[in-house]
Amino acid sequence: MGMTIAEKILADHSEREEVKPGEIVMAKLDFVFGNDVTMPLAIKKFRELGVKRVFDRERIAIVLDHFTPNKDIKSAEQCKSSREFAKEMGIKWFFEGGSVGVEHCLLPELGLVLPGDLIIGADSHTCTYGALGAFATGVGSTDLAVAMATGEAWFRVPETMKFIYEGELQPYVTGKDLILHTIGDIGVNGALYKVMEFSGSVIEELSVEQRMTMSNMAIEAGAKTGIIEPDKKTLDYVKERAKRKFKVYKSDEDAKYYKVIEYDVTNWEPVVAFPHLPENTVPISKAAKMNIKIDQVFIGSCTNGRIEDLRMAAEILEGQKVAKWVRLIVIPCSPTVYWKALKEGLIEIFLEAGAVIGPPTCGPCLGGHMGVLASGERAVSTTNRNFVGRMGHPKSEVYLANPYVAAASAVLGRIASPEEVVK
């Protein structure tokens, strides 16, 4: 019996000929990482193990991205403990200040996570790297501590659901809409502890960055990871960045899937996920007619803060002004993205429109800082979660959308279609 990409990666990394769903394996890891929120507890657990050194100083990253720049004394202390640990252990890949970016943008951009890798990170959106053909999943700080010490982790081999996207994408429909539509279809528990394998001609046409958006949100359907078979686009992306050798895996033709779901996307349009779950999707044609007034728009995050996302937003915002009483916050997800946005004139477009530009940080996405919502406020956000209180007060509301829709909504002061602005 053939195996899926995910099964092949787990088999190779556990030194087995094959694995089957439900089996428990102990596997060697290619890369592990944590951030300023999850690393301090991992460090504490690491010390409790009595281990004197990490398994490999070049296969661990610490990315201080959630509350950067430090928002208060507590976050400063968390970053300090992570910094001191990195110095003590000689960890090569430590990022803060001018080098830091949102981890799930930064690590692929620097070639630290690669096709065929087995990766764990102490952050739920680690599944982003599945877009490169890696098996990447989030863990807690205790598992991270053990992984830093041993370079290994245990896994229960998940079943795989295959999603096939065919047809032709319409204007302003992006990878964000594909994954939101999918979550709206199967629900937030629709892929619980499954691998979501994305395929089809539409996926082949997507850029690597838009594929990352899709894999990033696999966790919002309960998935273990979201994976895409590497192709020429993938290899072109990683070859100029890769810091080490990598191996490409592809699913066998006779691989067994838990379920196969096929979509024709030809008539799909941008969608908005209403509070308070990503599954509450509404087509923009309907949402735009509901006259939902907003207070804030956030364009950024590990979901939609890459250069292509900023280009989408700038396409709508050029020559426009943000509506009165609306705050538009734009945060490039890495220093490289920020530089590109500057050189391409995107930052100028955002500033002229009336946006606030922030340094690379997770910040507003988790209601951490630099864009926290007050009671009763509504935000349109290009992020991945809209749970109760996600971006601030428990009585605030978050509507998830792609960068085109977010930008149009900022201009009109309500949830709006980009076609209402670009006529």
Curated annotation (Swiss-Prot):
Pfam families: Aconitase (PF00330). Keywords: 4Fe-4S, Amino-acid biosynthesis, Branched-chain amino acid biosynthesis, Iron, Iron-sulfur, Leucine biosynthesis, Lyase, Metal-binding. Its EC number is 4.2.1.33. Pathway: Amino-acid biosynthesis; L-leucine biosynthesis; L-leucine from 3-methyl-2-oxobutanoate: step 2/4. [4Fe-4S] cluster binds at residues 302, 362, 365. One of its GO terms (biological process) is L-leucine biosynthetic process. The keyword Lyase applies. Its cofactor is [4Fe-4S] cluster. GO terms for molecular function: 3-isopropylmalate dehydratase activity; 4 iron, 4 sulfur cluster binding; metal ion binding. Gene3D superfamilies: Aconitase, domain 3. It catalyses: (2R,3S)-3-isopropylmalate = (2S)-2-isopropylmalate. Binds 1 [4Fe-4S] cluster per subunit. Heterodimer of LeuC and LeuD. HAMAP family: LeuC_type2. Catalyzes the isomerization between 2-isopropylmalate and 3-isopropylmalate, via the formation of 2-isopropylmaleate. Belongs to the aconitase/IPM isomerase family. LeuC type 2 subfamily. This is 3-isopropylmalate dehydratase large subunit 1. The gene is leuC1.
